[in-house]
């Protein structure tokens, strides 16, 4: 079971990738892009927290690294990530 705050930021990151159609190596977002989108959504997290959560999502297979953008790594949503988002949304609707 993932804790509430950890779950929220991980879901938010996946949702940002989903809404920005970052679903392939070519169409992927940098960590900075993700941080800016989080801020635009009213969520402010430190760079290290966002970095750690992205790494956790990569490790779980929900996110993969895309093609580099300048010197920055990019990230995109996998089909497993989309399925996990649907599961979380289903859990929330059932509460």
Predicted regions and their residues:
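Short amphipathic alpha-helical interaction segments
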Residues: 44-59
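Minor-groove-contacting beta-hairpin "wing" of winged helix-turn-helix DNA-binding domains
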Residues: 70-77
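Short acidic, hydrophobic short linear motifs in intrinsically disordered regions
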Residues: 24-38
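A short, conserved structural fragment
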Residues: 58-68
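Short alpha-helical segments that sit at the start of domains
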Residues: 1-26
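Short, amphipathic alpha-helical interaction segments positioned at domain boundaries
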Residues: 79-95
């Amino acid at each position: 079971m993932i804790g509430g705050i950890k779950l929220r930021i991980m879901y938010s990151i996946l949702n940002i990738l989903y809404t920005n159609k970052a679903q392939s190596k070519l169409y992927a977002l940098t960590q900075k892009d993700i941080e800016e989108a989080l801020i635009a959504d009213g969520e402010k997290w430190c760079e290290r927290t966002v970095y750690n959560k992205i790494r956790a999502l990569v490790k779980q297979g929900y996110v993969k690294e895309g093609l580099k953008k300048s010197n920055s790594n990019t990230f995109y949503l996998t089909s497993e990530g989309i399925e996990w988002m649907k599961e979380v949304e289903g859990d929330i609707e059932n509460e």
